[in-house]
Each structure stands twice: as C-alpha cells, then as structure tokens.
Amino acid sequence: MPGGGPQGAPAAAGGGGVSHRAGSRDCLPPAACFRRRRLARRPGYMRSSTGPGIGFLSPAVGTLFRFPGGVSGEESHHSESRARQCGLDSRGLLVRSPVSKSAAAPTVTSVRGTSAHFGIQLRGGTRLPDRLSWPCGPGSAGWQQEFAAMDSSETLDASWEAACSDGARRVRAAGSLPSAELSSNSCSPGCGPEVPPTPPGSHSAFTSSFSFIRLSLGSAGERGEAEGCPPSREAESHCQSPQEMGAKAASLDGPHEDPRCLSRPFSLLATRVSADLAQAARNSSRPERDMHSLPDMDPGSSSSLDPSLAGCGGDGSSGSGDAHSWDTLLRKWEPVLRDCLLRNRRQMEVISLRLKLQKLQEDAVENDDYDKAETLQQRLEDLEQEKISLHFQLPSRQPALSSFLGHLAAQVQAALRRGATQQASGDDTHTPLRMEPRLLEPTAQDSLHVSITRRDWLLQEKQQLQKEIEALQARMFVLEAKDQQLRREIEEQEQQLQWQGCDLTPLVGQLSLGQLQEVSKALQDTLASAGQIPFHAEPPETIRSLQERIKSLNLSLKEITTKVCMSEKFCSTLRKKVNDIETQLPALLEAKMHAISGNHFWTAKDLTEEIRSLTSEREGLEGLLSKLLVLSSRNVKKLGSVKEDYNRLRREVEHQETAYETSVKENTMKYMETLKNKLCSCKCPLLGKVWEADLEACRLLIQSLQLQEARGSLSVEDERQMDDLEGAAPPIPPRLHSEDKRKTPLKVLEEWKTHLIPSLHCAGGEQKEESYILSAELGEKCEDIGKKLLYLEDQLHTAIHSHDEDLIQSLRRELQMVKETLQAMILQLQPAKEAGEREAAASCMTAGVHEAQA
C-alpha cells in the first residue's frame, strides 16, 4: 500500500507519486520549498497541485457512513482505523481549518426514521468546480482557464499557494461553506482515471463566480474528484426561486447511479468532527431542523409528529400533511370539548332533579311526613353541593382551550402581517404562504422573556400581598380581591407560556391570505361574544350580597323564634304555678273559717300565715309573668319586623336573579346566532368543532333557564291562587285549620259549662265553688292552647318557606305536647261531667221527694 505523506497527508494516487514529489522538491528553489512546507500544514482545499497528493481509499473505507439522529461512534472508529491503514490521519484534515463548528452544524440534518447518506450525488450535465479539486492528471489547463475567469484579479502565472490562499480568504469572508465540503478531499478508486474529461461547455453552468452554493453543486472534473457536500438549505433559499428548489429536491430524490462514483465516504471525518456535528445538531432549534430536513426527506420515510407536540405543528409540505395535522389537533381537543358538554348536561340534570325534589318535599310537609322531608332535604343539600362544583361554561372559554385559541390568533396575525408584506411586493394572495419559522423566532423569544419576567413579578407581588394581608386585617377584603386578580393573571401568563413552544406556523402557512383574514375575524368576533356571557360558578356581586343578608336574617329569625318559644314556656310554667296557688287559697280560707268557728286559733294562725305566704308568692309570680309577657310581646314584634325584611330581601333577590337570567339568556341567544353564521363559512376544522360544542352548551343553558322560569311561574301562580281564595272568603280567617284547633278545646269547655250549669244550681255552695275553680282553670288552659296553636302555625309557615329543618323538628315536638295536653284535658273533663250529672240528678230527685212529702 502506498505510504502516507507528512502530517497525515494522504498517499499519492499511484506508485510514482513519491518520485514525482521528490523530483519536484529538487527542482524548486528554497522559497518554493518553504512554501511547500507551509502548504503541507494547510487544509486540503488550500494546497497547490505540486503538493503531496491524496491517495485513493479502498472500497471498504468508502462505505457509506450513516447516523440516524447522531454520529455513530462504532462506525466512526471503524472508518478512522481504515483511514489510518491507508496512511491517513483522520484528525489531520482538520488542523487549522478556517471553518468553525457553527458553520458546520447547519449542514447536518437528522430525520427520525431515516439514515443520512453523506456523499455527493452527481446530476446530469453538472460537475464540481476544478478550483476546489486536486488535479489527478495532466489536464489542468481547463481548470486554470476557469480560475482565471472566476477571479480576474489573479494572474495565470501566480502560484497555487496564492490562489488557494485567496480562495481561503473568500471562504472566511463568506462563512457559509460547509465543513464537509472543505475537509473531504479524497477520490474514489472507481472514478479516477476512468472518468472521461468533462467538455468545456459544462463550465457555462456557473452564473456567479463567487457563489459557494453554485460551486458546491457542480460535478467533478476530469478525475471526478469531488470536494464538499450540498450547501445548507438556508443558503439555497436566498439564492434560488421556489421552482428551482422544487427541481433540486426532485433531483435529490431521484434514483442513484453508480454508488462508487456518486456517493462520498464520510469516514475521513474524525470523532471530534462527529461530536461537534452531533452537538450542533442538538443545539439547533427544532423548527429550523424540520424546515431544513423537509426537502431532503424521502417520500416514503416522512417523519411523524412528535407525541409531545401533538396538535402543535406538522408537516406543511402537502394537503395530506395539513389534514393530518388538523386531525391531530382535533383528537387532542375533542376530549376537552366532550367533558365540558357533559358537565353542562349534568348541571341541567341537577337543576331539574332539585326542582322535582323540592316539589316532593313540599308535598311531604303538607302530609306531615317529616321523615321523608328530612331525607329529601339531605338529597337536596347533596345536589346543591354538586351544583356548586358543576357550573355552565362555554367550551371555547375553557382556560386551556381559550389560551390555545389566543395562541392561534397570534399566529394568524403574524401570518397576516407577512401576507400583507408579500401582497405589497406583488405576490399572489391566494397561494399558500411559505412561512419561515426563523423570522418568527426572535418575536417568540422576546414574548417568552417578557412572559417569564411578568410571571416572576406577579409572583413577587403575590407574596407581598400575602404579607400585607397578615399585617393589615382591616384591609383583608380589598387585598384578597387583588390577590385573586393577580392569581388569575398568573394563570393566564402560565397558560400563555404553555404555548410558547407550540409552533402553528406550518398549519397557518397552508391557508391563503383571504382565509387567514376570515379566521382572524371569526376568532375576534366569537371571543368577544363569548366574553359577554357570564359563565361563572356563582351569581354577580349584588346578588351574592343580598343572599348574604338573607342568610343573616334567617339566623336572626331562628334566634328570635327560640327566644319567643322559651318565653312562652316560662309563661306557661308561671301560669301553672299561679293557678295552683289560686286553687289552694279558697281551700285554706275555708279551713281557716272552720278553725275559727271551732275555736282552734293556733290552727287558724298557721293557716293565716300559709295564706299570706301563698299570696305573696302569687303576687311575685304574677309580676314576673307580666315582665315575661312584655318581653315576649317585644320579641314577637321584632320577629314580625325581621320577617318583613326577610320577605323584602327575598323579593329583591328574585328580581335581581330574574334580570340576571334575562341578560344571560339574551347574550346567549346572540352568541348562538353568531356561531350559526360562522359555522356556515368556517374553513378551520378545529374552530368548527369548538363552535359546535359552544352551540350545544348554549342550548343546554337555555333549557336550564327555561326550567327555572317554569318553576318560578308555578310558584307565583300558586301564590296568586291563594290570594284569590283569601279575597273570595273574607269572613273565613286565613288560618282556618289552626282556628279549628284553637276552638276545639273552647267548644269542649262551653259544652261542659252548659252541662255543668244545672248541676251548679242544684248542688250546694261547696260544689259550686269547686266547679267554678275547675271551669276557670280549664278556660285559661284552653286560651293558652289557642295562643300556642296560632304561634305554631306561624312558625310552621316560616319553616316551610325557609326549609329550616331544625325549626320543623322543634315545631313537631311542640305540636305533640299540645296534643298530649288536649287529650289529658278531655280525659279530665269526662269524669267531672259524669259526676256532675249524677249529683244533679240525685239532688233533683231528693228535692222532688221532699216536696212530695210536704
């Protein structure tokens, strides 16, 4: 195998390469030798034709080098070892290379699922420029002529070193030549002397002498030696029209010819170059890699969307790719829309079920089935908690989807601005816009920086507000409101940051300028209309304040009602004691008279002291009873005023809720009309799906409002019917049932009195006195029972309207006590009535006998 040259220079092409170099060294002056030594340390593309040649590599070394997504270390090591066997140092080609790593990085494009073949694919009628190739034979005159035509400032008798130095300076100035083009300077064995010389007419393909893009796309010279690889897509996009780019992509995707002559081995690159290229490929931005790799991708090996960015971007190279991207977005957001609609339907079901349970509860209370009413109340409370957690919300106003739609609107606005620029430059507005993500990257980076700064500032502000809340309790409500506002802003900023990495440019780029304008206007109209519908979990502030006042009044009603009940109990106890004392006093007076008539003066003295103590006790109890009655009357008046305030606030809340529901209904109807008009001319599949979900949510909201209105109208109609009945029968008191209950013991007392009167006339004085005391006691008890029944009836109405279960249970116990008292009185009256009738009959019979005897 031929030996290698100094500093890792490759061996000569043939066996006479060494002698030729030796002869050249002897013939050249010392200055030329010095230049030769200096040139030997230069990169390959800057060396002259008299310098050490580059040996041919074996076919094993020329194997295609593949790396899917990165450089393979095993293949790099294999290529490096084979290169050293041929006398090549893989690191020698990169010594003092004027091309930086950043310049080499964009040339490497990795496509997932495909293998990148590094090599030159020769096209028909093209050749690589001889300026950057090593002459392998004596036919270098054409190359010198082309070099003279390319750079008129250089003379034909200039040395190769000066020419190459000038070329190196131009490479440094341009800064866009890929490193692979500068460092790969080997010739394949199969395309050496066998390749015929290219005719001179092929030189006319170059239109620009200094375009490195044009030079890198040329074909090999007489020996077919190629230096470089296709230029970066960024350089081509600035110098070629879209038609030329399409033709070039088609030629790249065409069938390959002889792989030995048309593919360049990449095994001469060292591990350091591989690492640099891999690092640069990792550091490059994802949109740039995607845009660069799209023209080089095989039709059958197109990469799919990244699962982490599903719905955020796609391949905009064809209509099928566009539909695939929209389908991905639809698959991502359809579950969100479905969940929102399910929550709306569930809330409507909860509202309907609550109305039915309330009706059943009212029926149970009317039928005195309080156990059923208690069970229904528990179910109603559970439904109320579920209603609070489930609130109506437009799918398009859902936080994540609303943020995404805002991001889409921003992308559409950016595309519109670019389309306006293209329209001003005379481009066709109906053709899809070819977007360049690199132009939008600075704006995205700036907005990202601003959002992060804004979020940090908001977080600091929130912490400061928390400290102020702890220090200043007096300003708690104001600071909490501000804290809520900042929290919402933080959530909005975080939602905006969520879409910073989501590039919709490929999708937006598929729409024409007219379609972009329609989508932008539709987004603005629908977002503005949806913002007018107050889809919140709780009503407005005015209604909430009134509801809080009603709650406080309800608590006051409970407290006052409890006080009135306690005072009534105390009054009843005091009356009972006073009645007992009044029952004992006549008996003590009679006993005192008998003691005095029987000359039992010590007994009469004791009875007098007993009568005096009972009298003083009765006076004290009567004073206390009068005070309790005054206090009870005050509480009753206060209870009446609180009930009036409660009813007034209830009416005001109902009025506010009616107005609020009316406004919501009107705004919802307007939004539904807007959605129906937009759906007819919608060009965006995602927006069409979102608007359909919004339309369904609006229909559910209208149905729930109609259910509530129907329930309210039924309640109003029932109240009107009750008022009509009361107005049609004025002699009948409003509380007829309670009056009947109140009159029942009085009727019993009157009947007892009517039956008792004859017996009183016939009986003696002692019987008359006992009957009088009994009748007075029973009359007072009946009067107390009547008052108690009236009070219980008022409390029962209050409990029914306020759904106060505690008060209902208390009233149940009170009614049970009244029933027991009435039953005891009836049992007490029956024996007295029978005894009085028997005594009256006996006395009458005795009187008749005496008269007959007389």
UniProtKB/Swiss-Prot annotation:
Entry keyword Coiled coil? yes
Q: What is its main location?
A: cytoplasm
Q: Give the region (Necessary and sufficient for interaction with PCNT and localization at the centrosome) as residue ranges.
A: 446-854
UniProt biased composition (Basic and acidic residues): 285-295
Site of the Glycyl lysine isopeptide (Lys-Gly) (interchain with G-Cter in ubiquitin) crosslink? K372
Task: Tell me which SUPFAM superfamilies the record gives.
Answer: Prefoldin (SSF46579)
Region (Interaction with NDEL1), start-end ranges: 802-835
Question: Which InterPro entries does the entry link to?
Answer: DISC1
| Required for localization to punctate cytoplasmic foci: annotated segments | 440-597
The segments labelled Disordered in the record are 1-24, 179-205, 221-257, 278-323, 716-739
Give the compositionally biased regions (Low complexity).
296-309
From the record, what ranges are coiled-coil? Answer: 366-394, 452-505, 602-666, 802-830
Q: What segment(s) does the record annotate as region Interaction with MAP1A?
A: 1-292
The biased composition feature labelled Gly residues covers 1-18
State a single Gene Ontology molecular function. kinesin binding
Q: Which key words tag this protein in UniProt?
A: Chromosomal rearrangement, Coiled coil, Cytoplasm, Cytoskeleton, Developmental protein, Isopeptide bond, Microtubule, Mitochondrion, Neurogenesis, Schizophrenia, Synapse, Ubl conjugation, Wnt signaling pathway
Taken from the UniProt entry, a GO cellular component term is: ciliary basal body
According to the record, the residues making up region (Interaction with PAFAH1B1) are 727-854
The record lists the effect of L822P as: Impairs interaction with NDEL1
List the ranges annotated as motif Interaction with FBXW7: 197-203
> What is this protein for, i.e. what is its function?
Involved in the regulation of multiple aspects of embryonic and adult neurogenesis. Required for neural progenitor proliferation in the ventrical/subventrical zone during embryonic brain development and in the adult dentate gyrus of the hippocampus. Participates in the Wnt-mediated neural progenitor proliferation as a positive regulator by modulating GSK3B activity and CTNNB1 abundance.
Record's subunit section = Interacts with NDEL1. Interacts with CCDC88A (via C-terminus); the interaction is direct. Interacts with GSK3B. Interacts with tubulin alpha, ACTN2, ANKHD1, ATF4, ATF5, CEP63, EIF3S3, MAP1A, NDEL1, PAFAH1B1, RANBP9, SPTBN4, SYNE1 and TRAF3IP1. Interaction with microtubules may be mediated in part by TRAF3IP1. Interacts (via C-terminal) with PCNT. Interacts with CHCHD6. Interacts with CCDC141. Interacts with FBXW7, the substrate-recognition component of a SCF (SKP1-CUL1-F-box protein) E3 ubiquitin-protein ligase complex; the interaction targets DISC1 for proteasomal degradation.
Extract the PANTHER family matched here. DISRUPTED IN SCHIZOPHRENIA 1 PROTEIN
* Disease (UniProt): A chromosomal aberration involving DISC1 segregates with schizophrenia and related psychiatric disorders in a large Scottish family. Translocation t(1;11)(q42.1;q14.3). The truncated DISC1 protein produced by this translocation is unable to interact with ATF4, ATF5 and NDEL1. Schizophrenia 9: A complex, multifactorial psychotic disorder or group of disorders characterized by disturbances in the form and content of thought (e.g. delusions, hallucinations), in mood (e.g. inappropriate affect), in sense of self and relationship to the external world (e.g. loss of ego boundaries, withdrawal), and in behavior (e.g bizarre or apparently purposeless behavior). Although it affects emotions, it is distinguished from mood disorders in which such disturbances are primary.
Q: What is the protein name given in its UniProt record?
A: Disrupted in schizophrenia 1 protein
Specify the species.
Homo sapiens
Question: Corresponding gene?
Answer: DISC1
